[in-house]
């Protein structure tokens, strides 16, 4: 009998493609609140400013797109690759969501939830989409600070099924009390009984109480919760993105510390959450290295009073597998 030992290459391999700060990118300010990978572009939404497009693979500036309205906050892409941007309800501006039409080179209105119709203040401070907003079933989600409620709308073939002024409301009881910053929310699928991913924080500047630390959870329609061990990340979660590569599911997290000056170093962490039972693992547990497949070097200290941060992911097939680009 012959025994052969065949080495198994790692499932994932990570490398830094480029790194630039706001000055390097030519951004007018540090108030950059939305991030999306839009085709071959990295799209950066400046708060109450334009959308800057960069070459995703080099960081080279390409062009600028005027914002749809004032107080534009977030940038996302839907499942079909459309660029989606949104305005938060500040100064009674209302929560508005648009997609950008390349053909017409203009923003198309998808949702206008006005303050006069009862839109809560600051709703839209965070936003996400699921599906293709122009065809078939899609969803728009909006969240705000100092709340426990997630608001969402269903669309069919680009039209609202849920009236703009009558959003579906999902109260997230497992939070226990109101979050202080608008949570990030992601729908797992378009199925009616889809799970959801959420990260939220109750952090108050100057307070390092462990009970206020950010949490990342998966929850079902019946509010069964699978929680990521909070020891696996820094004090604040700024943003996340859950993505699939064939049959595997990965979680990309942007986290940051929180000192008395609302600052700290930040990292990117990637977890293999295909087997969700591993989410209970902490850094000192056996098997953690196979669960947390990547941790970046910690960034220099940065102040981040509003806990702004985003994670954008783009996947493309290659001759040997997939290249996945993660930007934050």
Show which residues each predicted segment covers:
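Loop/turn-rich, solvent-exposed surfaces of beta-rich toroidal or solenoidal domains
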Residues: 232-301, 309-311
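Beta-propeller fold detector
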Residues: 11-23, 61-69, 105-118, 160-175, ...
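Structural motif
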Residues: 49-53, 91-99, 145-157, 204-217, ...
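Repeated scaffold domains used in trafficking and secretory/extracellular systems
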Residues: 27-36, 67-80, 86, 115-133, ...
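C-terminal edge beta-strand
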Residues: 1-8
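Beta-strand-rich domains and repeat architectures in extracellular enzymes and scaffolds
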Residues: 20-49
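Asp-box/WD-like beta-propeller blade repeats and closely related beta-sheet repeat scaffolds
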Residues: 100-148
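Short coil/turn segments that connect the beta-strands within blades of beta-propeller domains
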Residues: 39-40, 80-82, 135-138, 194-196, ...
